[in-house]
């Protein structure tokens, strides 16, 4: 058994601005797990809100975990032990996805088939961040021209208020007239209840598909108020980190958005899917600042998920990994054993 770590800076084509700030690049940690002639790849995207802010912190956490002894345990047992040890989810995800990739390769199956999912078929959204109208006008064609993108997710919740949100949204509508895309909105918790009630009706009148995380994480009382008279489906993102979070808000939302970096990997994502379904909720899977390695791992589950938002690797210049192309609007890893992605050798550190 051998673990190799590679630290890589991911540079974005376009900065991504949301209600909480702007990201220009990220320094991710890639893990290569080798055993019995097979290799598994995993990726961690550190974040201040996720418990490990740097690639160095991620590597230290993983090395400490590995040093406790991991031979002879199942993937699920190792995940549960990592949670007990309080290993940051955005760190442990690299091991979890590497273990699943390795297991699928050993079984000679595509990961999605090992997990019991059909081939991905639902188109992914591509995201545009908070920007002034003149930037939106320039950026929309750069995101959509010559692509097979079918849905655009618009980040709102501007620090400048809902008037700025409306101005930006109207420019998006104008700039997308020549492209056959559906529009979705993610406020990243940037509104209070009154703003959310107003904006949801305003957006519903403009044929938006759904609204994601209208209120701050933890505002279950506000969600209850919104849900009673919602004109749009409500999905929560920041409010849903683990499967055990779901019962607290299940009666007041229409669906949940899971992310591997939030929950710690495929192992917990499967539990989130099952728990959401048990509560009659729809599912979405999203991403953070990730390359094709983490995206391909997430895409292995998309045959059983309602909405897909796996696009961060399309905003990299360049993507240091290979394996999650956009085909007819769908993020579609190759049908080969494992999740299908790997770090390119020129990015080995």
Curated annotation (Swiss-Prot):
Q: One MF term in GO for this entry?
A: racemase and epimerase activity
Tell me which EC number(s) this protein carries: 5.1.1.-
Q: Which domain of life is it from?
A: Bacteria
Coiled coil (UniProt feature): none
Q: Any note on cofactor binding? A: Binds 1 Mg(2+) ion per subunit.
Where, in this chain's numbering, is Mg(2+) bound?
A: 186, 212, 237
Which terms under GO biological process does the entry name?
amino acid catabolic process; peptide metabolic process
Q: Which residues bind substrate?
A: 127, 153-155, 259, 309-311
User: What Pfam families has UniProt attached to this entry?
Assistant: MR_MLE_C (PF13378), MR_MLE_N (PF02746)
Please provide the record's keywords in A-Z order. Isomerase, Magnesium, Metal-binding
The cofactors named for this UniProt entry are:
Mg(2+)
Q: What else is known?
A: Part of a large, functionally divergent protein family. Protein modeling and substrate docking was used to predict the substrate specificity, prior to biochemical analysis.
- Function of the protein: Catalyzes the epimerization a variety of hydrophobic dipeptides. Epimerase activity is highest with L-Ala-L-Tyr, and lower with L-Ala-L-Met, L-Ala-L-Phe, L-Tyr-L-Ala, L-Tyr-L-Met and L-Tyr-L-Trp (in vitro).
What family is reported? Answer: Belongs to the mandelate racemase/muconate lactonizing enzyme family.
Name of protein: Hydrophobic dipeptide epimerase
Q: Which species is this record about?
A: Flavobacteria bacterium (strain MS024-2A)
């Amino acid at each position: 058994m051998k673990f190799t770590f590679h630290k890589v800076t991911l540079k974005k084509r376009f900065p991504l601005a949301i209600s909480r700030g702007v990201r220009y690049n990220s320094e991710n940690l890639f893990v290569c797990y080798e055993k019995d002639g097979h290799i598994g790849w995993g990726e961690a995207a550190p974040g201040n809100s996720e418990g490990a802010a740097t690639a160095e912190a991620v590597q230290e956490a993983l090395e400490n975990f590995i040093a406790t002894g991991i031979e002879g345990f199942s993937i699920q047992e190792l995940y549960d032990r990592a949670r007990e040890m309080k290993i940051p989810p955005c760190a442990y995800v690299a091991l979890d996805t590497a273990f699943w990739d390795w297991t699928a390769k050993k079984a000679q199956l595509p990961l999605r088939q090992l997990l019991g999912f059909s081939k991905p078929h639902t188109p992914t959204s591509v995201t545009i961040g908070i920007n002034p109208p003149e930037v939106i006008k320039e950026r929309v064609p750069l995101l959509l021209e010559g692509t097979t993108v079918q849905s655009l997710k618009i980040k709102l919740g501007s620090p400048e208020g809902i008037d700025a949100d409306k101005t930006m949204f109207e420019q998006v509508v104008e700039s997308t007239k020549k492209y056959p895309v559906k529009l979705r909105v993610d406020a990243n918790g940037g509104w209070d209840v009154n703003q959310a009630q107003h904006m949801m009706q305003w957006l519903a009148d403009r044929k938006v598909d759904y609204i994601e995380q209208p209120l701050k994480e933890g505002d279950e009382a506000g969600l209850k108020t919104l849900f009673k008279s919602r004109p749009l489906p409500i999905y929560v993102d920041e409010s849903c980190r683990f499967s055990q979070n779901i019962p607290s808000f299940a009666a007041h939302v229409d669906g949940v958005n899971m992310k591997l970096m939030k929950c710690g990997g495929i192992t917990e994502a499967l539990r989130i899917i099952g728990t959401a379904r048990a509560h009659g909720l729809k599912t979405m899977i999203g991403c953070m600042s990730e390359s094709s390695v983490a995206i391909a791992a997430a895409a292995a589950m998309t045959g059983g998920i309602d909405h897909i938002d796996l696009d961060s690797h399309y905003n990299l210049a360049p993507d240091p990994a290979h394996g999650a192309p956009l085909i007819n609007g769908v993020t579609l890893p190759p049908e080969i054993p494992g999740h299908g992605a790997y770090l390119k050798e020129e990015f080995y550190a």
